[in-house]
């Protein structure tokens, strides 16, 4: 997309640009019975959340916990509003988006600690949520895909009040400390660039050996059924492919789906790239099958 690049203008201006791009590139939020703000107690104060539900009332069941992308630096509850509303409709499940702390103001591991805390809060079915949560489905795109995996690992090792039923990392930064061929193949001209990724990493300032940044340093044995989605023209495509392979090798029921001919960020580009709608719908159909298989067992 034309215009200044995130790494050229700094975090504050880059966040404004991301909001503006939603207005021209993404689909509208559309009708939904419930869109409601709430908050969870986090390690450094309140974590803003947003609940999306196609129903005004709902019985006990799974809840999708969504963590937005943006390189750990950009994005918020508003940038991914249309996507969260859409998957709430397509899955017919409540979706709760997490407004975690962003770098560089809050470097690693602040954001992922918020995501884990939010997951534990939602799992406890607090009165403020107004839902009887029986299980979680962790989900996120890009940096949020990293968080989805890390949250699943954290709750595998130290279980919450309810289990993680499935995970859905979308073009995840699953092994960001390792180089892969797709980084060179698609690092220029496909929206996400080499320079942007290096800038995100500098802002986030993670420990590359820590599983809360590089979740593939941990065994994936015992992880929930997993749907890994990549984009065919994405510099971090191969990270998602590698993560899917690691899950298969660990005996995790895994579905891998690649949006061929699409780019990083496509879930926020349904107006600019209309085929993204079909890519999203195909993913949700698979996820519904994974969830149904687990809930009927």
Report each predicted region and the residues it spans.
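Alpha/beta-hydrolase active-site loop
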Residues: 106-126
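Alpha/beta hydrolase fold serine-hydrolase catalytic domain that processes acyl esters and thioesters
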Residues: 133-134, 149-297
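Alpha/beta-hydrolase fold nucleophile elbow
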Residues: 129-142
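Short beta-strand-to-loop junctions in surface cap/lid or active-site-entrance loops
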Residues: 41-43, 49-60, 216-220
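A glycine/proline-hinged amphipathic helix-loop "lid/cap" segment
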Residues: 1-51, 211, 291-297
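Short amphipathic alpha-helix adjacent to the substrate-entry channel of hydrolases
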Residues: 78-97
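Short beta-strand element of the alpha/beta-hydrolase
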Residues: 60-69
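Glycine-rich nucleophile elbow surrounding the catalytic serine of serine-hydrolase chemistry
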Residues: 140-150
């Amino acid at each position: 997309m034309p215009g200044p690049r995130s790494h050229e203008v700094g975090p504050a201006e880059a966040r404004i640009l991301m909001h503006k791009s939603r207005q021209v590139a993404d689909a509208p939020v559309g009708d939904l019975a419930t869109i409601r703000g709430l908050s969870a107690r986090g390690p450094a104060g309140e974590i803003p959340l947003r609940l999306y539900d196609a129903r005004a009332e709902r019985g006990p069941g799974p809840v999708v916990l969504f963590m937005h992308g943006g390189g750990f630096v950009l994005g918020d509850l508003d940038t991914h509003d249309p996507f969260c509303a859409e998957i709430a409709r397509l899955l017919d499940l409540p979706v709760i988006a997490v407004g975690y702390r962003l770098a560089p103001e809050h470097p690693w591991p602040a954001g992922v600690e918020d995501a884990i805390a939010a997951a534990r809060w939602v799992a406890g079915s607090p009165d403020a949520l107004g839902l009887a949560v029986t299980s979680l489905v962790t989900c996120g795109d890009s940096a949020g895909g990293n968080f989805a995996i890390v949250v699943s690992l954290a709750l595998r090792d130290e279980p919450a009040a309810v289990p993680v039923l499935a995970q859905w990392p979308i073009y995840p930064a699953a092994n960001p400390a390792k180089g892969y061929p797709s980084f060179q193949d698609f690092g220029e001209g496909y929206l996400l660039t080499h320079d942007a990724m290096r800038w995100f990493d500098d802002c986030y300032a993670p420990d590359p050996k820590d599983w809360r940044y590089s979740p593939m340093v941990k065994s994936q044995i015992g992880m929930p059924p997993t749907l890994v989605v990549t984009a065919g023209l994405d510099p971090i495509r191969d990270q998602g492919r590698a993560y899917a392979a690691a899950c298969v090798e660990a005996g995790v029921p895994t579905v891998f789906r690649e949006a061929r001919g699409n780019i990083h960020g496509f879930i926020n580009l349904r107006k600019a790239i209309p085929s993204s709608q079909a890519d999203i719908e195909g993913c949700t159909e698979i996820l519904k099958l994974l969830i149904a298989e687990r809930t009927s067992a």
